[in-house]
Amino acid sequence: MSLRLYSTLGRETREFTTVAPGEARMYVCGVTPYDVTHLGHAFSYVQFDTLRRYLSSIGYLVRYVQNVTDIDDDMIMVSRRQGGRPIPEIRDENDRIFRNDLDRLNVLRPSAYPFATEHIGEIIEHTAKLIECGHAYVVDGDVFFEARTFERYGQLNGVTLEELEQRENPESKRAEKKRGKLDFLLWQIVDAGDPSWPSPWGPGRPGWSIECTAMSVAHLGPRIDIHGGGSDLRFPHHENEIAQAECSTGDAPFSGFWMHNGMLKLEGVKMSKSLGNLVLARNLMQEFEPDQLRLYLLSHHYRADADYYHGDLEQLGERYGRLKLASSQGEGAAAAASSGRALIAEFRETIDNDFDAPVALDVLDAAASRLLAGAGSDGEGEALRECLAVLGFAFAGAKGPASGYLGSTL
């Protein structure tokens, strides 16, 4: 069985293929570092990190790009609230905490980690191209993408443009200037004192979605294999990305697979700073080992919404301890023994089924139980360790955050 992944675009699970043989190009939407990151962010990045590790283990050279949205409304708002504190200072402080959290969770560092403010030139170039091609228009220094000029707008969400017009649109800024309700900003004029850059349309700053398009194309080219992000980004952000990327570059599809992780809530309620219910990964890692938190996150299917309840990690302690202890059984033995090959094959079969990490962990749980009961072989112990390493567990010898290309292991 070959790897099959579910793509939001088309609502189907199909065989994973890439633009360039043997190479997988992944772009995952990163954070806006106006505040510290919470458990929901950790859920997303651990899931995509594990997929990246699996692709490497089966022979792909993975080019993984994750951006930083370091200029947007939220960054400006926080700067104002903090008495005009410089945005780069806010960004660097929160980004440092974020990177440290992911390092402790053994998340591999991206192949490229671009900041939006480093790509203003490319953003302006894409915007100018979209105007030239008739997909964008200028109104008093603001530049809008005209959604109706892209006939497939709505395809990612499986609806027509008319149906999307009935939805609440988070990109409703400057509505009085728009030709159509779904049109969105590519470039915008700014209030006095806010960060701005020179452009053919006057001083301003980028819109939200064009930033990701410019960074993805700059680092991975006009076509990629996997675009990842939270399910809350499907509309309008990812819908906009498809439209502007394919219209600007002339290449399609922009991404072969669109993968969206579910939302992690706190006891049924969305985590948000305004509600004061953020669960911070760094706080949990003061009480529990980072690998135990990683196990908790991978015990939920990446596409499913999940609820975090206080006490969940504590209840996971026995399972974590069993896997950790069993992974030391038969150390140094060859996983090529028949029992080891069988375990690896069963593990791969579950991951190949739309990256089903929870079922893969069940398979490894069963192997751990056999080993601890004295019914497993040394080869199975080594195979267990290899599989746990592919899932990114440091206790099993997984490569650390600073590792580059991992190479084949399974």
Q: What positions do the PLM features span?
A:
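Structural preference for alpha-helix termini/caps and helix-kink/transition segments
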Residues: 270-272, 277-410
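The substrate-binding groove and active-site-proximal loops of carbohydrate-active enzymes
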Residues: 78-87, 111-117, 230
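Short, glycine/charge-rich beta-strand/loop segments that flank catalytic centers
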Residues: 68-73, 95-98, 108-123, 141-150
